[in-house]
């Protein structure tokens, strides 16, 4: 292991020298003792010609030379456009996770070990030549004994030691950056590496990917928008995934889509609808929707349907995040920057002590120029990125779910405008958002929420009774205090008032909207009313 670490260190050093990454480092505002290293590094003693490559290109090529783990780290960095200079972020978007396949016989051996059966006992046909190969796994086409056409994904052998060493060096570099640079500390490099560590280890577990794919397939069962291939659970293991083989055109195959006369406007709009459906209806979204993972069905090109694969990375939002995100977008497009600032504070995305006026002014300064463009030219992803950049100056905490959301939105938006350059994302999304906001406050939704809470009321009633008993019997070791001397009296009266109002509202809703449930649910409302009255009038 130590030998591997030393070899990796020398490899990193060679790449740094080759692409002159030390020039990028010493261009930063570093402490004097770090800048003094320029004069003691042997390779800097020799005259060197000025590189013709930009810093972004050099950084990208260096990551490619360092191998798959650094490539995937660069891909993760490319999603953090709120942290990186624009030229570097643009170059990192070009990173391709393509590596030569590993030995076919070794792949067969690994599959047989995982399945506990011979290939010929499970598959009537197995193509030894892989369909695709990436840094974490490779994919083979096959046919099950029962006749279904499938693909078999198998994790590369021996990855964990390599990943462990590369992550160790990434953590060392991140900690050094945090110690020597105040600017670097604002970017939270250690947190970025920690996020990457979780992502890369999650991708090694194919059962997790299978579960994600099954969930996404269930969410869009019978949908005209998106198809997700079936997972064959009987043949899925931690390092082997067997799922339905799909046939379609890659979403970037513009010539093929044109040849089958695909309705490109509808295809682009459906991509936006899929995104907002995942975010606001399901709160479960495919977070790796780059063009390599998206296909278009060849059936019914006048009503095109997407096909999604590779569900290794997914994201989700809490109901609170959903609500704040929707209201942020509405407030932004109304140019209500004070509302945007207030929502960031209310949501906890920025500290509560943030000065509202200063935050509002910063958001206005960054975002107002965006509205000089027509709506169809405004980028949702850029809007989120600008908001995050501004909020970071006010100590916004890193929100992993929002980072995944921003990455997914940038992918969907870029793809939609590639398919149909005139796509007006706001006009496409606005009706969906408005409908979602209406549904959140509809009587049906409120009743559903109330009914789910009713199931908890017996437990709450028991807790209320215990609380009242404890308050009426002070602890033996504590001297009794007069009620009027108790500091918690205002709080208890406020709780009592809330119980009174809550009980009254519940009783009214049940009598108006669910008469058939009245006999079942009247007693929890009565308990709330009695408890509230007791807390208010007691002496």
UniProtKB/Swiss-Prot annotation:
Belongs to the ABC1 family. UbiB subfamily. Residues 125-492 form the Protein kinase domain. The gene is ubiB. The keyword Manganese does not apply. Its main location: membrane. One of its GO terms (cellular component) is plasma membrane. It is found in: Cell inner membrane. This is Probable protein kinase UbiB. It comes from Pseudomonas syringae pv. syringae (strain B728a). Its EC number is 2.7.-.-. ATP binds at residues 131-139, 153. Is probably a protein kinase regulator of UbiI activity which is involved in aerobic coenzyme Q (ubiquinone) biosynthesis. The lineage of its organism: Bacteria, Pseudomonadati, Pseudomonadota, Gammaproteobacteria, Pseudomonadales. One of its GO terms (biological process) is ubiquinone biosynthetic process. It is an enzyme of class 2 (transferase). It is a multi-pass membrane protein.
